[in-house]
A protein has these predicted regions:
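Terminal cytosolic tails of multi-pass membrane transporters
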Residues: 108-115, 130-149, 165, 169-181, ...
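A conserved active-site cap/scaffold subdomain adjacent to cofactor or substrate pockets
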Residues: 74-116
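Membrane-interface loop-to-helix entry segments
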Residues: 20-46, 116-119, 208-223
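Transmembrane alpha-helical segments of multi-pass small-molecule transport proteins
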Residues: 1-22, 88-100, 150-153, 183-201
Length: 255
């Protein structure tokens, strides 16, 4: 069982590294994973609310229960416990990558539009997804066969998509690119690096709390440096330079 687990992890890492060799692959996987998720929601929704003994009306009744989350939000926030700690440190650990990666694709978009695109609009399908999952759990509906396989496949695709974006980002930042080393050396080097880091997380000294704390320190350090050294330059920024706009048609032609 342990051997199979590491084999799956290695396959996911290898797929993510290969996808990161081209921004075209990253884009295809990103769009593909989103459509697969919507397809999974549709499949699970139909299995729950179009089956015998159920109705579409029960979906709306269950969906309305999401309002209780906001009414009782204070109970989920305080007191802070180990769950909050783990989630927050995980969020901070990913925030640097997510922020920098997103910044490359939001040229010309206002801050409120970025907020809507990344937090508000995605919350709608996620809300529907958790409504469906809750209905399955509350009514003891078994998840078997194609539904179970679809959940595993979509979940794995999302992991690959997240990881290939991370690989693409740090290789560009450190100039460890395919253009510099070639696809074979790039692939082998990054697979070895990520596999090694994955194994290190089995050790007690490397935990998400430490990684998250390091990320918080980096964020605060960079923010302080910008305020002290580049404040005037930053406040003069009105919008993203035109040269930062990405033309995906040109990317597809190059690839």
């Amino acid at each position: 069982a342990i051997g199979s687990f590491y084999l799956i992890v290695f396959a996911v890492i290898a797929a993510a590294v290969y996808s990161s060799t081209s921004i075209r692959y990253v884009r295809i996987l990103s769009l593909g994973s989103s459509w697969l998720f919507l397809g999974l929601i549709t499949l699970m929704w139909a299995g729950a609310f179009l089956s015998e003994g159920s109705s579409v009306g029960e979906f709306f009744t269950t969906f309305a229960l999401l309002g209780d989350y906001f009414v009782n939000l204070h109970n989920f926030i305080l007191p802070i416990n180990d769950y909050h700690e783990f989630y927050l440190y995980w969020w901070f650990a990913w925030s640097i990558m997510i922020g920098q990666f997103t910044a490359r694709f939001v040229s010309g978009i206002k801050t409120y539009q970025v907020l809507a695109a990344m937090m508000i609009f995605p919350s709608i399908p996620i809300g529907i997804w958790f409504t469906v999952l809750y209905y399955y759990s509350a009514n003891a509906i078994p998840v078997t066969g194609i539904s179970n396989l679809a959940m595993v496949f979509v979940g794995t695709t999302f992991v690959i998509n997240s990881l290939d974006s991370l690989v693409r980002l740090y290789t560009d930042n450190l100039n460890l690119t395919v253009k510099r080393f070639g696809k074979t050396k790039y692939f082998i080097g990054n697979v070895a690096l990520l596999s090694g880091l994955t194994l290190l997380f089995k050790l007690d000294f490397l935990q998400i709390q430490w990684v998250g704390a390091l990320a918080i320190g980096l964020i605060l350090g960079c923010f302080g440096y910008i305020l002290l050294a580049h404040y005037r330059k930053v406040v003069e920024i009105k919008n993203s330079p035109k040269e930062n706009k990405i033309d995906f048609n040109k990317i597809e032609l190059v690839n």
